[in-house]
Amino acid sequence: MSLYYEPDPANENDPPLLPPILTPIPVVKDVDVFAKAIAVAGKSETGTVLYSENPEYVEVAIILSPEVPKIKCNQMLYILMVAAGDAIGALAPPEVAVTYAFPGFIFLNRGEAGFVKIEVAPSTDDKSIPDWMVVGLKLRLNNNIEICEHEINADITSLADEGGG
């Protein structure tokens, strides 16, 4: 039995059900979640998860407290890319190819679907341990971009376009 079992589907207005070490904080639709997380990182608890209430995107930013020097913190970018790919793989059909490109782009069947970002607290030395770090993900759920009929942009896709939503 799991601690996180839900007998009924979650209500759309309920906050996400996360492990106790993580604290979800909603961010209104038109605010940049990553920028907000950076702004509050110095005074927030480790494990604070800011998420957008915008239904068009999965947009999250997680505030962390690194235990390694600043130069090694960049490894979290790749960890978040792979974690996002694993989550997409659980939702999308098996024939959907999930690929990545530096610096943090996520592609579904060669179409750009999202990206991951990282920001580390400013410090003077790459060998010092930063006070905080923010990792963020933005993934397009629906492709509701207004497109002129003569300008089809096949380079942009979404989870729904690829059969995963």
Task: State the predicted function of each range.
Residues 45-59:
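N-terminal, Lys/Arg- and Ser/Thr-rich interaction peptides
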Residues 59-60, 138:
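A generic structural motif
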Residues 98-110:
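Catalytic palm active-site di-aspartate
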